[in-house]
Design a protein with these regions (language model features):
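N-terminal, intrinsically disordered, polar/charged segments of Gram-positive cell-envelope systems
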Residues: 1-57
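Generic hydrophobic/packing signal
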Residues: 4, 15, 53, 61, ...
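A general, composition-driven signal for non-globular sequence regions
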Residues: 5-7, 109, 148, 213
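Active-site beta->alpha N-cap acidic-glycine motif
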Residues: 32-149, 234, 253
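A general structural signal for well-ordered secondary-structure junctions
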Residues: 85, 111, 213-214, 244
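Catalytic domains of cell-wall/extracellular-matrix polysaccharide-remodeling enzymes
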Residues: 119-217, 221-239, 243, 250-257
Length: 257
């Protein structure tokens, strides 16, 4: 399989990677170790937005992790009915079915960010190298499927979890150096716990009211039927409370743990 060409907006910086300067160090452990990952995946870069953040007051950001899945098209239908754009942090596979769903998400005007290729916490958080390898796989699939290079991502388990304590800071530093921005959330639907319609609806509305810019975590796996069933009513209720809806980008101030 051949990878799609990387668009002009995604490029390595002109500066020499940190790993080359590390060779000059008198400490052999430094020269052979910590920063060697900076030379990995030389096309894995994004143009970092450095302007002012857009006004996100009274704006809801619906985010869906772990898809696409057999429920993606149903979810897209309800979003389309309400004329709402959302953000999908995907766990993509190299299958035509997945590629077609990624294209459908993108063509509908939603934002696609990287979540993970494997969602294997122990594997991806073992080192910065391991994280980059997993991220690059998901990144390339999205790029090949949609022609658009994602520049935002969400850590599996969130940016603070039991698996990334030793590697978290180095991963964030390296991903920031490469131009990528991560988003956590401030409202958790807890749909992963299998809650029914009423509980999801009540919890999301109650928690969303605490923020002027709620970033709501949902999931788009194949067993999250209730998320699909409740989403339209949640959108209508939040609209009635005066909220607008948007999709995440680097122009939105990120919610980070």
């Amino acid at each position: 399989e051949t990878s799609a060409a990387v668009p002009e907006t995604t490029k390595a910086p002109e500066t020499t990677p940190a790993s080359s300067s590390a060779v000059e160090s008198t400490d052999s452990s430094v020269s052979s170790g910590a920063d060697s990952y900076t030379s990995l995946f030389p096309t894995l870069y994004a143009d970092k937005y450095d302007g002012e953040y857009e006004n996100s007051e009274n704006t809801v950001y619906l985010t869906f992790d772990d898809g696409p899945s057999v429920l993606t098209e149903n979810l897209l239908y309800y979003l389309r009915q309400e004329n709402v754009k959302a953000t999908f942090f995907v766990v993509p596979e190299r299958t035509e079915y997945c590629y077609s769903l990624l294209r459908e998400i993108s063509n509908a005007g939603h934002t696609i960010g990287v979540h993970s290729a494997s969602h294997d916490y122990e594997k991806i958080y073992a080192s910065v190298d391991a994280f980059l390898e997993d991220f690059n796989e998901a990144y390339e699939i999205v790029l090949e499927a949609t022609g658009k290079a994602p520049d935002i991502y969400r850590f599996p388990g969130g940016s603070v979890n039991d698996y990334n304590e030793k590697t978290r800071d180095d991963i964030i530093t390296e991903m920031d150096r490469r131009g990528f921005t991560y988003f956590d959330w401030n409202v958790d639907s807890n749909d992963w716990q299998g809650y029914g319609w009423t509980t999801l609806y009540t919890n999301v509305l109650k928690d969303a009211e605490e923020f002027s810019s709620p970033v709501i975590l949902f999931h788009n796996t194949g067993d999250r039927d209730n998320t699909v069933l409740v989403i339209e009513d949640i959108i209508k209720a939040l609209k009635n409370k005066g909220y607008k809806f948007g999709s995440l980008s680097q122009k939105i101030k990120p919610v980070q743990f």
